[in-house]
Amino acid sequence: MRNSVEFSQLGLKTAFNLSQNKTYTSAVKKQFFSTGAFLSNGGNIDLNKHTQKNIDSKYVACNSRSVTPPNDVASSVSKNTLRHKQRLMMAQWLMSPEVQKAKSSSSGNVGLGPNTNQPFPLNPFFKPPRPISHSLRMKITDEYLQGASIEVLARKFNTSPQRIEALIKLRRINDEFEEKKKPILHSYNEVMEKMLNACTKPEMMQFNDGNDIPLRSNPVSLWKSLPEGETFTPQEAAKILKWPSIEELNMRQNATHFHKTSDEHKDLNEDEELISSSPSEVGKRVFRLIDLSTGNVYRRDTGGDIYVKRKKSTT
């Protein structure tokens, strides 16, 4: 039988399955009760030498309002072990002196640190993207209303097209509220922007929406929605892209080849004389050579024939 032991404290939940193997069972029990003792005693118990050795290096003084990120867990451990160590690191951080001091502080501005762009700098596990301020959102949407496309704005402000679309939707809702004279909490917005250190300038924005980077600077959208089952031929795609169709390209190529052949026949005037023919020397180009001593012009065509145009004597 496999028994399940579940423990929950300080918002941390750990589950361990105990198997029939005595060695595995004793090891898991030891790990479980060490975790429980650590949390119940306020995080002062020694978990292991490595954790105790590095616990001082994970934190700095609260006056600087900055915490060194926790040590990286080895990538070779299993997922369950990784989650367990992450929970222990979070528990250690919750029991750290700087967090306890922040909890007991009477100041309401505990989520901000001086000279930092990260909100809640005391928490090394909190790394969200910076929001966009109301003034910058209005600037972006104003350019959209003036005719700028979504992709151009995404490239200009270093963000994704999806985020620009979301800002446009928010602008529409904001305009609807103003038309209906519904109250808008501008003061709350200003407070939250200060707390989260929102971006107020375009150069402060950082792309953080995955790999969906706008690659094209073409302001014309080339997306086309089709009903299910409807065919979309290459000819229709060529019309939308304003490209010539394959038939037109073939006609142009044939016409060019015809003109080249006609030009070659024009060169076969009465002044030229066939002096040599070699089918083994067939090529793709026509060569012309001039004999500077006599002034004669030699031409070898693509079929391997060599012609000469002798210079007329001026007597």
UniProtKB/Swiss-Prot annotation:
Keywords associated with the record: Mitochondrion, Ribonucleoprotein, Ribosomal protein, Transit peptide
Main location: mitochondrion
GO cellular component, one term: mitochondrial small ribosomal subunit
Keyword Phosphoprotein: no
Pfam families: Bot1p
Location relative to the cell: Mitochondrion
Keyword Magnesium: no
Family: Belongs to the mitochondrion-specific ribosomal protein mS45 family.
Complex and partners: Component of the mitochondrial small ribosomal subunit (mt-SSU). Mature yeast 74S mitochondrial ribosomes consist of a small (37S) and a large (54S) subunit. The 37S small subunit contains a 15S ribosomal RNA (15S mt-rRNA) and at least 32 different proteins. The 54S large subunit contains a 21S rRNA (21S mt-rRNA) and at least 45 different proteins.
Function: Component of the mitochondrial ribosome (mitoribosome), a dedicated translation machinery responsible for the synthesis of mitochondrial genome-encoded proteins, including at least some of the essential transmembrane subunits of the mitochondrial respiratory chain. The mitoribosomes are attached to the mitochondrial inner membrane and translation products are cotranslationally integrated into the membrane. Required for mitochondrial protein synthesis. Has a role in mitochondrial integrity and cell respiration.
Name of the protein: Small ribosomal subunit protein mS45
Organism this protein belongs to: Schizosaccharomyces pombe (strain 972 / ATCC 24843)
Gene behind this protein: bot1
